[in-house]
Amino acid sequence: MFKKLIRYSNKIFDLFTIIALITDRRIRSQIPTVKIITAVIIMYFTNQGSLHGLSQEIAYKRLKGFLPSVSTIARSADSMDIGSIREVGQSIYKKARAAKMLAPCHGMWVGVVDDHEQATSSYCKCKYCKSRTVTRKDGVKDIQFYHQFVAFILAGPKVSFILDIEPVLPGEGEISSAYRLIERVCRNYPRAFSIVIGDGLYLKETVFKLLKAHRKYAIAVLKEERRQLFEEADRLSLLSEPKVYRKGRTYYRVWDHSISGCWDGYGRGVRVIVSEEATPVRAHSKDGKSFEEKVNRANRMWVTNLPRSEDPGSLKNTVSICHSRWQIENQCFNETVNIWSADHVYRHSKNAITAFLLLLFICVNIVGIFRIRNIKDRSIKTKIYLIRLVRSGFHTARKPLPTIPPIPI
């Protein structure tokens, strides 16, 4: 399975050709950067989890003369050109989009943006670490150092494609970093999406105006009850009848309000969508001897400048698009952390952390497309099982790695 993934990556995406464009700032380097990038990609494809895991495989397979040492990989990551790594991601996206490997989400191309804390430590730090003071149960205060980044993904029904990330620097908030990220993504992927969804922090006039300038629509969660938009939507919901429908096991009561004059910073009218959701579930009783029926209820509100359609199913589709925001939590953060060890710090420096994350997300995108488009064996039902097959295929390969074409090492 490892050889099959390597051949697929090079045949469809020219992966081991375009990574030759990645450079670093080492002076008089004896090992080409393409060898280092190849080693990192092999580490991610085989899900080693750390540079030490890769070093053990190198020693076991007797590849010390063909793959660089982990110390060389770490030093090179400090000076890798982040822009050229992003260009590799753009090339893979263009080939995937042209081959129709990606599909729209509920009929529209939807981008989702959110932040994630990668690592937290009380003693490991660098000058780009953010810090905070936490109080333990015994009252002792500790200083935590951590790295944080904002990610932008393209939501989809089967595959969520991770487009780009931006680190959150010390002294700035998530929105400042997200503003740079959204601006760069709109420039590098101008036709990749038409809607951008964010949580309650993105209900800012600066974000809505930026997306409007790039001819994109915005959707943000409305949570703050003190906002005039919240109060006006709550009042209008009492005066109008909702649209009632069922999707799956969930029952929906949805209101769609057009409100103007309640958001002075934005200066334009917006839509506020209110959704009351009830999902019946069967759960264990408190005594643990029987089951009981319960109803999980949730009230959600979103603000958007997406124009209203006269299609009766448009509101139902818009609510589904709003729910696609969870893909960045489930398929980006949770999956990459639990399966791909995305929270592991391979090298504690700002440039290295960003480089390793971008290369990881490139590999995650390729494996996701490979599983959906190329795997015909019905016994391979989960991504975890596929990754184990790839890793075992590399571990049991008899021939040395350089004989596996077309890796240029």
Please report, for each region that a protein language model flagged, where it lies by residue.
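An anionic, glycine-rich sequence signature occurring as long contiguous blocks
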Residues: 217-325
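Domain-level cores of phosphate- or acyl-group-handling catalytic modules
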Residues: 172-229
